[in-house]
A protein has these predicted regions:
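Adenosine-phosphate binding glycine-rich loop
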Residues: 117-157
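ADP-ribose/adenylate-binding Rossmann-like module
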Residues: 75-79, 86-112
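NAD(P)-binding Rossmann-fold cofactor-contacting core
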Residues: 35-53
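Glycine-rich, highly charged phosphate/nucleotide-binding loops
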Residues: 54-69
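Glycine-rich adenosine-cofactor-binding loop
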Residues: 7-33, 135, 157
Length: 157
């Protein structure tokens, strides 16, 4: 039996806080900015790739986490290599009713970040519930290839 139910929710205009400034934070950020959400990203060291992202819905703070950053946040994404920080911040967030995604600990997740396939009017997500990221990405790539092939064939009819 599963603990997590796969459903789509309206996140329009919601606020996400990403704690972390590296590769995983960058991937999460790029995914989120495909949707109509606001993102605050905070980290003492933000990667050059993230700094290059220009978006009016993004606020970057190159500093250590402070509890005040949880104000008005709906969802928290923890993407650092500091497990103690993740534990402390997730506890603060949950006390405020904020859902948590911890990129380094699936047991500390209230929601998962799936691989997303979007093509025309299709939006498909694939997840292994944090168990096998490589398999998830492989399956998502197979689906992408199939959808590209299928939509090309359908248009030629």
């Amino acid at each position: 039996m599963y603990d997590f139910f796969p459903f789509y929710i309206n996140i329009q205009k919601k606020y996400f806080l990403i704690v972390g400034g590296g590769k995983i934070a960058c991937r999460r950020l790029k995914t989120l900015l495909k949707f109509d959400v606001n993102v605050v990203l905070i980290a003492p060291d933000i990667s050059p790739e993230i700094k290059l992202i220009q978006n009016e819905r993004l606020r970057l703070y190159e500093q250590a986490f402070e509890e005040k950053f949880l104000d008005k946040i709906n969802y928290l994404i923890l993407a650092t290599d500091d497990k103690d920080l993740h534990k402390a911040v997730s506890e603060l967030a949950r006390k405020k009713g904020i859902s948590v995604n911890d990129a380094s600990c699936k047991e500390n997740c209230d929601f998962y970040f799936p691989s997303i396939i979007d093509k025309d009017e299709l939006l498909i997500s694939v997840t292994s519930l944090g168990n096998n990221h490589k398999l998830t990405h492989r399956i998502a790539n197979i689906i992408r290839k199939y959808i590209n092939k299928f939509t090309t064939q359908t248009r030629s009819l």
